[in-house]
Swiss-Prot record:
Main location: mitochondrion
UniProt modified residues of type N6-acetyllysine: K96, K219
Gene name of the record: DHRS2
Annotated binding of substrate, by residue: S172
Name the record gives this protein: Dehydrogenase/reductase SDR family member 2, mitochondrial
Binding-site list for NAD(+): S46, I48, Y185, K189, T220
Length: 280
């Protein structure tokens, strides 16, 4: 089944003029740009979520990280605190209301308000077709990937209003280019694009901007079906416009920008971080 997923990605890349210079993912030093701000990042103990949490903390924010497993929270906390970053952590299954309440309480322990919410948590428990997916799996994917960001935001909203804050949802390039055998996951990530635009409209009067980051193929545990296959991974890189596959840090910088004053006039956008254009 995993090979079906891999085949589904092969149609994404189109021949074009390639850049001869490898692009840097390290970004520019923006230390302090988010000083004295508070960020909550879900699904943030590994991969893209962890990179985002680290970047926000490096840029001055106090960051609350979360994961479903205590051992993952402890490991991520040790790494970030070892770098001298201001972080707190808590176990949170975003699909559970009581866990979301505890996450909110943890964030409020520090300063009584929250400036940024980054929803990076997501699941895909099944590799298979859309119509072959059980109702139970449908409910699980949509609950975690789509409902939980909105419900968590509703719980945080009283503490985010009028702070010139930002909400960042993390979708997937599968929202634009569906992947074979990731049926319901594709649907859930497409739904986030609409959720972003709707929330942006609703929350603008409260001085909260809402945008969405849409990662392409990023080297994480989620994509190990690709980078674990050396020949397939090499083929992807050779046919990619930038001749490389993304790193988690490639997504982190754009999230920090979207939280910063530099993005104060950016709202309701779905921004692809894929190394190629997804649309006109």
């Amino acid at each position: 089944m995993l090979s079906a997923v891999a085949r589904g990605y092969q149609g994404w890349f189109h021949p074009c003029a390639r850049l001869s210079v490898r692009m840097s993912s390290t970004g520019i030093d923006r230390k302090g740009v988010l000083a004295n701000r508070v960020a909550v990042v879900t699904g943030s103990t590994s991969g893209i979520g962890f990179a985002i949490a680290r970047r926000l903390a490096r840029d001055g924010a106090h960051v609350v990280i979360s994961s479903r497993k205590q051992q993952n929270v402890d490991r991520a906390m040790a790494k970030l605190q070892g770098e001298g970053l201001s972080v707190a952590g808590i176990v949170c299954h975003v699909g559970k209301a009581e866990d979301r309440e505890q996450l909110v309480a943890k964030a409020l322990e520090h300063c009584g308000g929250v400036d940024f919410l980054v929803c990076s948590a997501g699941v895909n428990p099944l590799v298979g077709s859309t119509l072959g997916t059980s109702e139970q799996i449908w409910d699980k994917i949509l609950s975690v990937n789509v409902k939980s960001p909105a419900l968590l935001l509703s719980q945080l909203l009283p503490y985010m209003e009028n702070r010139r804050g930002a909400v960042i949802l993390v979708s997937s390039i599968a929202a634009y280019n569906p992947v074979v055998a990731l049926g319901v996951y594709n649907v859930s990530k497409t739904a986030l694009l609409g959720l972003t635009r709707t929330l942006a409209l609703e929350l603008a009067p409260k001085d909260i901007r809402v945008n969405c980051v849409v990662p392409g193929i990023i080297k994480t545990d989620f994509s190990k079906v690709f980078h674990g296959n050396e020949s397939l991974w090499k083929n992807f890189k050779e046919h990619h416009q930038l001749q490389r596959i993304g790193e988690s840090e490639d997504c982190a910088g754009i999230v920090s920008f979207l939280c910063s004053p530099d993005a104060s006039y950016v709202n309701g956008e779905n921004i692809a971080v894929a190394g190629y254009s997804t649309r006109l």
